[in-house]
Amino acid sequence: MTNNVRGYLQLHPFHLVGPSPWPIFTSFSLMDLALSLGLTAHGYIASIWPIFLAIIAVLYSMTLWFKDIIAESTYLGDHTLAVKRGLNQGFLLFVVSEILIFASLFWAYLHSALNPTMDLGMQWPPVGIPTISPAELPLLNTIILLASGVTVTYAHHALINGNRTNTLYGFTYTTILIALFVYFQYLEYSYAGFTLSDGVYGSTFFSLTGLHGLHMIMLTIMLMICTWRVYNYDFTNTSHVGAETTILYLHVLDVIWLFIYIIVYWWGS
């Protein structure tokens, strides 16, 4: 894992991206997925195959898109310091937008929780809603996420110090922990005594935890890509933008989950 200087051989600091089909393919795949989910939820489609095919299309488009980006960075030397700075700034803006989305969902939850109406029985949680104990699976998931923060920080320090073996171990352990989190979240949904259609409590609960769970699935894929790139000698101790953005993404989701645990599971139950 020596310093990679291939990104400094260009005569200008900008990356002039060539024509790529993957943005439009990904956009149409996401539109197909959204339509399939909406039509299935409202009973217009009786089969889950359209959703399954849409997910395959999204993953296929994103995989080939990421493949091109990795080739541009690692093998073509297109990612100069200016390009890396732009990628980091763009990802920070993405993180800010994600925080604002979760802030709006917290607002919706607290708007009803702090002032429950007569329709909710003048109490929160509403009458007849069996809440999930914060001392069971939610607490276990919180411990798992905190542990993943430790292992990914271990991987980050190993990467900066040029220790490929420990970096590989750190990312592998982190990937396993995040996958366990997603699995336990699935178990929690399976045994929950309420659904998305159970009033404002069910809709806000599953919107918050479900959106976070979707991001955790995305994070699992990102960690798997980082683990593979470390194994493939793609990262160096000075050039690892993909790893840094993934690590930042994990820490942001950790903090958001702590707010979900405190507000939704502990205070809200």
Curated annotation (Swiss-Prot):
It is found in: Mitochondrion inner membrane. It holds the Pfam family COX3. It comes from the Eukaryota. The keyword Membrane applies. It is a multi-pass membrane protein. The chain crosses the membrane at residues 21-41, 45-65, 90-110, 127-147, 167-187, 205-225, 247-267. One of its GO terms (cellular component) is mitochondrion. Gene3D superfamilies: 1.10.287.70, Cytochrome c oxidase, subunit III, four-helix bundle. Keywords: Membrane, Mitochondrion, Mitochondrion inner membrane, Translocase, Transmembrane, Transmembrane helix. It catalyses: 4 Fe(II)-[cytochrome c] + O2 + 8 H(+)(in) = 4 Fe(III)-[cytochrome c] + 2 H2O + 4 H(+)(out). One of its GO terms (molecular function) is cytochrome-c oxidase activity. Its EC number is 7.1.1.9. GO terms for biological process: mitochondrial electron transport, cytochrome c to oxygen. Component of the cytochrome c oxidase (complex IV, CIV), a multisubunit enzyme composed of a catalytic core of 3 subunits and several supernumerary subunits. The complex exists as a monomer or a dimer and forms supercomplexes (SCs) in the inner mitochondrial membrane with ubiquinol-cytochrome c oxidoreductase (cytochrome b-c1 complex, complex III, CIII). PANTHER family: CYTOCHROME C OXIDASE SUBUNIT 3, CYTOCHROME C OXIDASE SUBUNIT III. Belongs to the cytochrome c oxidase subunit 3 family. Component of the cytochrome c oxidase, the last enzyme in the mitochondrial electron transport chain which drives oxidative phosphorylation. The respiratory chain contains 3 multisubunit complexes succinate dehydrogenase (complex II, CII), ubiquinol-cytochrome c oxidoreductase (cytochrome b-c1 complex, complex III, CIII) and cytochrome c oxidase (complex IV, CIV), that cooperate to transfer electrons derived from NADH and succinate to molecular oxygen, creating an electrochemical gradient over the inner membrane that drives transmembrane transport and the ATP synthase. This is Cytochrome c oxidase subunit 3.
